[in-house]
Amino acid sequence: MTMESGADNQQSGDAAVTEAENQQMTVQAQPQIATLAQVSMPAAHATSSAPTVTLVQLPNGQTVQVHGVIQAAQPSVIQSPQVQTVQISTIAESEDSQESVDSVTDSQKRREILSRRPSYRKILNDLSSDAPGVPRIEEEKSEEETSAPAITTVTVPTPIYQTSSGQYIAITQGGAIQLANNGTDGVQGLQTLTMTNAAATQPGTTILQYAQTTDGQQILVPSNQVVVQAASGDVQTYQIRTAPTSTIAPGVVMASSPALPTQPAEEAARKREVRLMKNREAARECRRKKKEYVKCLENRVAVLENQNKTLIEELKALKDLYCHKSD
């Protein structure tokens, strides 16, 4: 037992000495490793494909070549795809922008056209107003109109119109209409109708004018018609038409016979057309029913004829039978 314990003590002492020496060697190796790290350098003949060779100088002066464990990175076999930058043009946005530009230009053109045109509401208000003055339509004057020379004033003779009843109608430049009978004195039988808005217009246009009678009543009539109020209070409309210059002297225009207002005439014509259409439909229906009735009668006659034939044959047979029995 004593020998075993002594051996154990010796082993433990040796282990302690060994540990102390290892610690001392480790402490001494640290500056040596630092020295080696300072002295070490890569081999000059090392290439990228061969492993790196490092020269290590020991403390005793010996030099040792150490191959590096860390190898240089080899080029990868997998190649990364080439990235190409593609510029995509947005067609939809360009079309939208083009449409927006077109809409802006269209709206500008429409605004310019509306600014050039006269105000239709203003014209309607002027026509519906009771003011005897001539309405004015303000329009933008073009450069050609502003640069046009001065217009000379020409005096036009007063036109005289004669109706089929013998009345004379004179229209002055101010828009007044004077009426005179053929058999009466010119001063006593003179009637004046004041027409507003009697300005000259372009041919082919229809202008409604106000005709003022002697009692102060205003009537809206077309520019080519004349309204005449008789002594009894009846108002008649005369439509003026220009006759050929070969038959009548210039300045004299014949007027047609008094015409009914257009609206009642159109209403009467429409009613007449409706009545005629209904009559045609009724006559067509009557003819159809008549044909059906005649056909039915013909069928009945044919049936009765067949029955009559059968009865005649039966009568003959009975007569023959009676004759045979009597014999």
Curated annotation (Swiss-Prot):
The protein's matches in InterPro entries, at most eight in alphabetical order, are given as:
bZIP, bZIP_sf, CREB1-like_pKID, Leuzip_CREB
Q: Which GO terms describe its biological process?
A: axonogenesis; cAMP/PKA signal transduction; cellular response to fatty acid; cellular response to forskolin; cellular response to growth factor stimulus; cellular response to hepatocyte growth factor stimulus; cellular response to insulin-like growth factor stimulus; cellular response to leukemia inhibitory factor
Record-linked Gene3D superfamilies: 1.20.5.170
Question: What keywords are annotated for this sequence in UniProt?
Answer: Activator, Biological rhythms, Differentiation, DNA-binding, Isopeptide bond, Nucleus, Phosphoprotein, Transcription, Transcription regulation, Ubl conjugation
Site positions (Required for binding TORCs): 300
Compartments, record wording: Nucleus
What is this protein's name? Answer: Cyclic AMP-responsive element-binding protein 1
Instruction: Provide the gene name from the record.
Output: Creb1
